[in-house]
Amino acid sequence: MSEIKQQRWKNVEYTKRQINDAGNTIRRDDSTEEELDFATTVIDNWRAAHAYPLHVIYMHLRRMTGTRRDILVVERLKRLDSIIGKLKRENGMDLWRMQDLGGCRFIVPTVDEVFAFAEKYKNSRVRHEYKRTYDYINNPKPSGYRSLHLVYKFHSDTKDTYNQNMLIEIQFRTHLQHVWATALETMGLFTKQALKAGQGEEYVKRFFVLVSSLFALKEGYPVIPGTLADEKELISEIEQINNDHHLVEMLRAIRVALDHEDGKKFDKQGYYVLILNYNTHRLRIRYFLPSQIDEANTLYTQIESNRRATGIDAVLVRAASFGVLKAAYPNYFADIGEFFVDLVEEYLR
């Protein structure tokens, strides 16, 4: 039985040099189709091998929540498009040291709890090596992104194969910060703009920056660089952008038709592959048992290999239930539009 369980997890099949070469191949403009195919295979394996370290850290975070139902914890492997985009934007980055191939989201009601739980994790008896903290709450990104990130280098006493510079990022954020981040991603998905990467229409980016500053004021923390810490001024500029471009109405209009069995039929912990066709606005969901990580990874890789031809976006997530999945990834269900818009319209009334 233990042998079967060990086979669930992918091992690293390539050297550090091969992994970094794969990143450089993706980055180059003159790479051949054959070189790109091999590079993608290497990236898929390096990413999939992070599933075990990610699982270990995810389970520790789950235990930290106790019986709290207002805390969401999910894990995800970074999307191939996001990996490629990051490699091309950051020329000096080695794929071997990309810190968010595996990531956990830990979502709590208040900023105080963000810092308290992050400190609790840092002071716990984990064997992983603490690397760094990124405080985007006290120092928000110019894009408007606000969250607290901890980065750890995974260490295992029992599975030495994973002690290979596998970095896992934990994102601690409030529900309000999560609403903003997923609304931005929703707008990006359905308008086909890479807003998360700082690309897209200037007025769309400015709208989200201003709303993020409003939310920062609400939480009592610094506003985004280039905006005023003045609620009336922020609201006035948001109103002007919305009057010109109708972004609130656009977000409210986004709908997704769920093309799956009733979520309650698989409302349990495990792996979910969310497959969103943003041309038809349809979402398919595939559920896998916790022991079926290899099958889930295989499907995820297959879908991503055809992503450009099919207009499909996919993500592989582990969650405790279907309800937690929907709450943590509302952008794939387009549930975020109503809630985000309601919050914004409170200010615009």
Stretch-by-stretch model annotation:
Residues 2-86:
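Intrinsically disordered, low-complexity polar/charged tails and linkers
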Residues 292-307:
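A short, charged, amphipathic alpha-helix used as a generic interaction element across diverse proteins
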Residues 309-348:
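Short, mixed-charge low-complexity intrinsically disordered segments
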